[in-house]
Amino acid sequence: MVATVTDEQSAARELVRGWARTAASGAAATAAVRDMEYGFEEGNADAWRPVFAGLAGLGLFGVAVPEDCGGAGGSIEDLCAMVDEAARALVPGPVATTAVATLVVSDPKLRSALASGERFAGVAIDGGVQVDPKTSTASGTVGRVLGGAPGGVVLLPADGNWLLVDTACDEVVVEPLRATDFSLPLARMVLTSAPVTVLEVSGERVEDLAATVLAAEAAGVARWTLDTAVAYAKVREQFGKPIGSFQAVKHLCAQMLCRAEQADVAAADAARAAADSDGTQLSIAAAVAASIGIDAAKANAKDCIQVLGGIGCTWEHDAHLYLRRAHGIGGFLGGSGRWLRRVTALTQAGVRRRLGVDLAEVAGLRPEIAAAVAEVAALPEEKRQVALADTGLLAPHWPAPYGRGASPAEQLLIDQELAAAKVERPDLVIGWWAAPTILEHGTPEQIERFVPATMRGEFLWCQLFSEPGAGSDLASLRTKAVRADGGWLLTGQKVWTSAAHKARWGVCLARTDPDAPKHKGITYFLVDMTTPGIEIRPLREITGDSLFNEVFLDNVFVPDEMVVGAVNDGWRLARTTLANERVAMATGTALGNPMEELLKVLGDMELDVAQQDRLGRLILLAQAGALLDRRIAELAVGGQDPGAQSSVRKLIGVRYRQALAEYLMEVSDGGGLVENRAVYDFLNTRCLTIAGGTEQILLTVAAERLLGLPR
């Protein structure tokens, strides 16, 4: 579903959802779709009309129509939210095409008739007519009209403009076609000197608005197929277990979730961009939404059938109806490739989507924060970290006096001011995880000793969690801690420890009660890395660097005052360490600096078709990531849990960074044959889908925690 921002959009969506849930409406919609399939034989090709009328009665077609034309005076975002829900319910008839017409028709009488559902509209996929400007008539054959049926009006392209023709006139003949997606009427239309009206809206805007509305439909299809697959995977049993407990099925469903979430945010963004006075904002947003939405709807519909198995391949199950709808959307919009190429062309021409979050609630803080940032910016580079720490700007989400206890909105405002002043926030690396854990669970003495020094850059930290044979499976760790006079003796081996050879302190998990259950009996220690008994052996990586290390602990003494929290409660603290994140959003271009750097490298380079398409898909991933970032930030500002969006952002983010590095290597000088910085970056990014939990583990976690699939 298109991500909601306002209460009005939530209410609009719930209105359609509630209507579709009723036995009469829901059953009628599906029955009408199936009746339409038989319409060319013994069925009823007009079975959509009563259901369409019911949807019109909810006010869907009037939601974005001005009040003086009989509408509700709402936004295109409201309209697309309702179209999304209608697509999820597979409401038949010219829903999307009529919705598009309400946005581009200027005649008040016709607009009012469309808003009420008295009239409906189709949209021609291709032109093929000759226009006589002297008589304002058109003649010719239009091969395919989506939503084309007797009694409606039709929008059709001609000579760079869009025309409006009424099928009720004698000069128009409508010939029904058997559509792949038989939930929608499809027709061939012949015009013989038929009266036409040239729309006042530009041809480009009509196409962009059509893409926006159809992207909302695609998002609805992607979500229904995901929900259907997940629901079935929870109850269908094989080999005595629900199939949703099998990793292969979990990963299939988690991938569907990733596609659905990207389709959601892209469709929502296109609807939002429609209100921008700068038409290029809608152009780029609509192209992104159409390309992502078409592919997401198609792929999810196919994977839904895969999860359903044999039942998904039967005529009786509705899954194939959504597969048909997905391909109908793609066919109408000309395929995702068309919009992908448009995304690439617009981006290379310098068009960028402008993204932001409404920070009105903290606008009063801006002068104060801007002044504090200006003081930091005036300092030499080497003194800025201490100043940022002392002012609470380094980690504003931490409690005072170390941070500002900043709300999500204030955090974003601070990021904006730092970016505007070109002040970079230093990276505390593992310190970002260690310090919050100490703040939340440590003693006052621990907090005072470690947190300020960490923020000022005096202490570099490493994380002693992963072990040979256990990796990131913390419950299986074997490093033991044995009681000693005044403290503990730690013995064991850690691996994949970044920066251990440079770190002054380490956060270490060790088993203090070997008889306790796996997740119990673990304690959280702060280890001085200069303590006798610690041996560090660098591990050479595929780049040639040695950032990772093996760390051997041989009766390493850790005093009692270096235990954080309660003994045997380390698992809970480790979860704090791994979960702590601040609210953040890119403050520069929506594509991010890495993509901008790639575009600079490409310059005027001649790319073949395959390279162009790969570039387009990278741009889509960059844009989707930025849109997810904005959505997560908006949810945080509104006091809501980002949930699925946050997990999806991590999954697509690492894939994107890997794909970007590989593409840059292949198009750079040497083409991957000669070792250079691009080759280094490619090799260096291979760890991104492994470090901190592999991609496959993250998919499993997403399937279980977000989709509720059984273990």
From Swiss-Prot:
Its cofactor is FAD. GO terms for molecular function: flavin adenine dinucleotide binding; oxidoreductase activity, acting on the CH-CH group of donors. It catalyses: 3-oxochol-4-en-24-oyl-CoA + A = (22E)-3-oxochola-4,22-dien-24-oyl-CoA + AH2; 3beta-hydroxy-chol-5-ene-24-oyl-CoA + A = 3beta-hydroxy-chol-5,22-dien-24-oyl-CoA + AH2. GO terms for cellular component: plasma membrane. SUPFAM superfamilies: Acyl-CoA dehydrogenase C-terminal domain-like, Acyl-CoA dehydrogenase NM domain-like. Pathway: Steroid metabolism; cholesterol degradation. Pfam families: Acyl-CoA_dh_1, Acyl-CoA_dh_M, Acyl-CoA_dh_N. One of its GO terms (biological process) is cholesterol catabolic process. Changing residue 581 to Q: Displays less than 1% activity with cholyl-CoA as substrate. Still binds FAD. It is an enzyme of class 1 (oxidoreductase). Binds 2 FAD per dimer. Induction: Induced by cholesterol and repressed by KstR. Its EC number is 1.3.99.-. Keywords: Cholesterol metabolism, FAD, Flavoprotein, Lipid degradation, Lipid metabolism, Oxidoreductase, Steroid metabolism, Sterol metabolism, Virulence. It comes from the Bacteria. Involved in the second cycle of side chain dehydrogenation in the beta-oxidation of cholesterol catabolism. It contributes partly to the virulence by increasing the efficiency of beta-oxidation. Catalyzes the dehydrogenation of the five-carbon steroid side chain of 3-oxo-chol-4-en-24-oyl-CoA (3-OCO-CoA) to yield 3-oxochol-4,22-dien-24-oyl-CoA. Can also use 3beta-hydroxy-chol-5-ene-24-oyl-CoA, and shows weak activity with cholyl-CoA and deoxycholyl-CoA. Contains two ACAD domains separated by a short linker. The two domains interact to form a single active site. Homodimer. Belongs to the acyl-CoA dehydrogenase family. This is Acyl-CoA dehydrogenase FadE34. It comes from Mycobacterium tuberculosis (strain ATCC 25618 / H37Rv).
